[in-house]
Amino acid sequence: MTTYFTPPRPRVFGHRGASGLAPENTLPSFALAVTLGADYLELDVHATADGEIVVLHDPVVDRTTNGCGPIAELTWSQASALDAGFRYTADGHSFPYRGQGVRMPRLAEVLCAFPAQRLNIEIKQGAPPIVDAVLAVLEAAQSLDRVLLAAEHDDIMAAIRSAIGGRVATGMCVGDVVAFIDRVTRDDWNGYARLGDALQIPPAHAGIELVTAASVAAAHRAGLEIHVWTINHAAEIERLLDLGVDGVMSDLPGLVATAVKHRKVSRG
């Protein structure tokens, strides 16, 4: 049986697709990430006013489209008419995806378009709650086994864990991460029980180094994978792989794929 964790490690994640090279969280961005070697597509979801689960990072559409306002106040008909390539620019001057028909996709469309990829889905919206609606989309696409559900906020993650009953892999919310890093700092693991399947964190936060040899080793002892975001420099990718992380998320997934490939070749 194939699952979210079936592909070999280290895992190559396309962060919002190949968002350094194409409009984030769109089908062209995801397709480019796959072409560049990503086995995993990281994305974010919200709901429209009429309940469609759409792939979008922000609660508003202003930053990535030619529209404005909260996605929760737009119907799917209105959201799907927006130009999701309108704001993308690699150089700050040219906008190659404007007017090219790039649209905000529904989660169901991404699942259908990329049946061989694993999806890392962050549920951004807490109110009104959309966990059940996301699960319904996953069940309809028979994709529960190839996704990991993530959430930054503790209340959303609690809702996820309550709803899934162990059927879907999960990440760790802020509260989980704080508790884990505190354990690493104190080197006290008495009574610790992991709540998720993967610790997905940046290398550092608020001046505190999070990804260290100690935290990687502790994660592995606890049965957790450790995935690091969002890394867009080859030297930093190499450093993290040297530490033994299980996956790297990047806006430029080709950099991660190249580093992983070279390691496999060098090891025979």
Residue ranges and their predicted role:
Residues 3-4, 9-10, 57-167, 192-222:
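Metal-dependent phosphodiesterase/phospholipase catalytic core, i.e.
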Residues 17, 46, 50, 58-59, ...:
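Active-site beta-loop-alpha junctions enriched in small/polar residues
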Residues 51, 134, 160, 240, ...:
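Hydrophobic packing residues within well-ordered alpha-helices of enzyme cores
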Residues 14-24, 94-102, 171-179, 205, ...:
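Active-site mouth loops of central-metabolism enzymes
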Residues 7-57, 62-67, 72, 78:
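Conserved N-terminal beta1-alpha1 strand-loop-helix module at the mouth
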